[in-house]
Amino acid sequence: KVQEALKKYEVLKNEDAEWHFIGHLQTNKIKDVLKFADMIHSVDRLSLAEKLDQRLQQEGRSLDILVQVNTSHEESKYGVAPEEALSLVKQTARYDTLKIHGLMTIGLFTKDEVKIRKCFKVLKEINDNIVKEGIDRVDMKYLSMGMSGDYQIAIEEGANMVRIGTAIFGARNTPDAYYWPSEKTDADRAKQME
C-alpha cells in the first residue's frame, strides 16, 4: 500500500490535495509514509506512536492522526481493542508531534446490519468517553467509519468521515493483506456472505 501511495503521490504531488494514509502501518515504512501523508488513520499501538514521534521530531513538524480501533474484534483486522482505546489516546497525546483528531474503525463484512451498526456504536461511545475526559492536545472531531457497503449505517451512527472508494472508482482487484489476507475484492466478499 505504501508503494502504491508513493506512486500516486509522485503523479499528483503538485495538485492541491490532502493525503490520508489508511491501512496498517509498519514502523519500517514510516519514513516513506511521511513523505506524503497529511493524516494517518491507523495509529493502533503505542510503539507506532513513539516511532512516528521520533521521526516527526527529526523533521521538525507535526502530523494529524486518527486512532484505529478494532470494534469488530476480528483477528484479521488491525486496531487497538476497544477497552484499550482510551489508554492509547492518553499515552499518544503526550507526543507534541501527534495531533489526535479522532477515531477510525472498519465494520464487519456481513449483511447483518445489526452487527455492523454495533461496531459503529462502539466507536461512537469510545469517542464520547474520550471527549468527556478532556485530554490535552486531543481534538476529537472525526469519526472515520463506513466504507462503500456500510457507509449509510456509519453516518446514521455518527460518522463524519467515510471511505467509499469502491463506490466511486469500482472494485479493485488487488489484495489487501493488511486486513483480509486474500485476493478477493469487497464485491467478492459480499457475494460470499449471501
Segments from the language model and where they lie:
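Conserved alpha/beta-domain cores
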Residues: V2-G149, E157, F169
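Conserved active-site alpha-helix within GNAT-family acetyltransferase domains
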Residues: Q152
